[in-house]
């Protein structure tokens, strides 16, 4: 979507309802919320005694870690492509 038009939707993350606004489609925003919910539940299975705040922070750390690893892989692939040119 990303045409500058704002979309508003309600999502459920870890039993909490959130209204989010973005430039992507409602389906995309719901998918993102679902991934966050899944990640929180995955971490909670391994650490069932974490309070919600610590669980949220640990989830954010894990997601940013995954993002940074993908970004590094992307940069490596980009360099490899430039070397072949």
UniProtKB/Swiss-Prot annotation:
Belongs to the ZapA family. Type 2 subfamily. SUPFAM superfamilies: Cell division protein ZapA-like. It comes from the Bacteria. PANTHER family: CELL DIVISION PROTEIN ZAPA. It is found in: Cytoplasm. Its main location: cytoplasm. Activator of cell division through the inhibition of FtsZ GTPase activity, therefore promoting FtsZ assembly into bundles of protofilaments necessary for the formation of the division Z ring. It is recruited early at mid-cell but it is not essential for cell division. It holds the Pfam family ZapA. Homodimer. Interacts with FtsZ. One of its GO terms (biological process) is FtsZ-dependent cytokinesis. Residues 59-85 form a coiled coil. This is Cell division protein ZapA. Keywords: Cell cycle, Cell division, Coiled coil, Cytoplasm, Septation. It comes from Bacillus velezensis (strain DSM 23117 / BGSC 10A6 / LMG 26770 / FZB42). GO terms for cellular component: cell division site; cell septum; cytosol; plasma membrane.
